[in-house]
Design a protein with these regions (language model features):
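Active-site-adjacent loops and short helices of periplasmic peptidoglycan-processing enzymes
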Residues: 1-112, 121-125
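Penicillin-recognizing serine hydrolase domain
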Residues: 73-223
């Protein structure tokens, strides 16, 4: 599901330039019902930095697609970069078919591979800063040249403050993901009371409530 965007953003941070302006194309549009969107339209102009924030904080699928097209020159080109990176870090049971994580039978991973991907991303300070954002302001220009501003809240309930971790555990941040096929998913980085880092992944929970309850049970093992 949307934990896919960890890889999307990691590649964008490695190959993209934050100040580059991206013009949204028809190829970036998402038609799937219920998909989380920034609601971009063809002709809108937005920086790579704002696409990255929208992808990670809001989990906007159209932003992730636009980001991928701008860096990979096409969705297919970017997906090839994602799969190459997965192989480089040893995530050999992973195959990406899109940059956002919406359901596709040829798009799959494992909890261990997601640990490898998140662990790789954690080496990037900008990524660490992103996953700690409680909220963000996304700024762009519509096709008529009018400035637009959208405030978004982090979908990670540990970060937005709606769920508390166990005593002594600090959740640095991570990425949520939810589809009918994948269930409720979460991959997070955390630290225990003595500062030791952990990466925790839960997939296929039957609800958001269950997901965060189970994650807290897992986090208690860190102390």
């Amino acid at each position: 599901a949307s934990i896919t965007k960890v890889m999307t953003v990691l590649i964008a941070l490695e190959y993209g330039h934050m100040d580059d302006i991206v013009t949204i194309t028809e190829e970036a549009m998402i038609s799937e019902s219920g998909a989380t969107l920034l609601d971009l339209h063809p002709g809108d102009q937005i920086t790579v930095e704002n696409l990255i924030k929208a992808s990670m904080v809001k989990s906007a699928n159209d932003a992730a697609s636009a980001l991928a097209i701008s860096i990979g020159e096409s969705l297919e080109g970017f997906v090839d970069m994602m799969n190459q990176k997965a192989l480089e870090i040893g995530a050999t049971n992973t195959h990406f078919s899109n940059p956002h994580g919406l359901t596709d039978e040829d798009h799959y991973t494992t909890a261990y591979d997601l640990y490898l991907i998140l662990n790789e991303a954690s080496n990037n300070q900008t990524f660490l800063d992103l996953i700690q954002m409680k909220e963000a302001e996304i700024i762009y220009m519509d096709e008529a040249g009018n400035p637009k501003s959208v405030k978004v809240t982090n979908s990670n309930r540990f970060v937005n403050g709606s769920v508390e971790p166990p005593e002594g555990v600090i959740v640095v941040g991570g990425k949520t993901g939810t589809t009918n096929a994948a269930g409720s998913c979460l991959a997070i980085l955390s630290k225990n009371a003595v500062g030791k880092w952990f990466c925790s992944v839960i997939l296929k929970a039957d609800s958001s409530e269950t997901l965060f309850q189970e994650m807290n049970t897992l986090l208690e093992l860190e102390n």
